[in-house]
Amino acid sequence: MTTSLTWHDVLADEKQQPYFLNTLKTVAEERQSGITIYPPQKDVFNAFRFTELGDVKVVILGQDPYHGPGQAHGLAFSVRPGVAIPPSLLNMYKELEATIPGFTRPTHGYLESWARQGVLLLNTVLTVRAGQAHSHASLGWETFTDKVIALINEHCEGVVFLLWGSHAQKKGAIIDRQRHCVLKAPHPSPLSAHRGFFGSNHFVQTNQWLADRGEAPIDWMPVLPAESE
């Protein structure tokens, strides 16, 4: 937290860079040619819409958007209400159940309530072709999200970065560990969760860090919008 700058303030120049314009152009051309791209165009930048720069308390780095029908909506690890909870998110819920008193596993995987509390759910690549994992990995999104991480590192103070898996850990190598809290573990995927994601206690450590700084902890129980009104 601690900056009055907005995403628009710090990203306006980046969004005019040729590589970024080319990324948007390529995605738009693929959509126009009839290729199904996830998430829908209106949702591509939802991570920034739901969590303003000055509100960022926690960053959870994902990699690729989900590439199945109706899943991706612009927030890493999250899926729309009514969509089956993906395996990695299910393992995140298992870790929460094991470590956060009173947490009960939700029946949905919609994490907007995390985002609105200051948890930036950032995929490092923001689009994907239907059914083709990593199909947009080389389009330029990685350059853009590297810049996003650098800007959070520069302009915010005391942010918790949850870096799960080698991809996220490489991406987060630039973070100033004197000013921010960096927590590393294997990815929550079923392939690696048992190698140290389970038992990492990251959700508890995150809230302890925030409490030590006098900030409100994250309520990790995901709430659907209608339930929170």
Curated annotation (Swiss-Prot):
Location(s) in or outside the cell: Cytoplasm
Reaction equations catalysed: Hydrolyzes single-stranded DNA or mismatched double-stranded DNA and polynucleotides, releasing free uracil
Residue positions of the active site: D64
GO biological process: base-excision repair, AP site formation via deaminated base removal
Keyword S-adenosyl-L-methionine: no
InterPro entries linked to this entry: UDG_fam1, Ura-DNA_Glyclase_AS, Uracil-DNA_glycosylase-like, Uracil-DNA_glycosylase-like_sf
Keywords of the record: Cytoplasm, DNA damage, DNA repair, Hydrolase
GO MF annotations, alphabetized: uracil DNA N-glycosylase activity
EC number(s) reported in the record: 3.2.2.27
A Pfam short name: UDG
Gene Ontology CC annotations of this record: cytoplasm
Gene3D superfamilies with a match to the protein in the record: Uracil-DNA glycosylase-like domain
Family, per entry: Belongs to the uracil-DNA glycosylase (UDG) superfamily. UNG family.
PANTHER family, per the entry: URACIL-DNA GLYCOSYLASE
HAMAP family on file: UDG
Function: Excises uracil residues from the DNA which can arise as a result of misincorporation of dUMP residues by DNA polymerase or due to deamination of cytosine.
Protein name: Uracil-DNA glycosylase
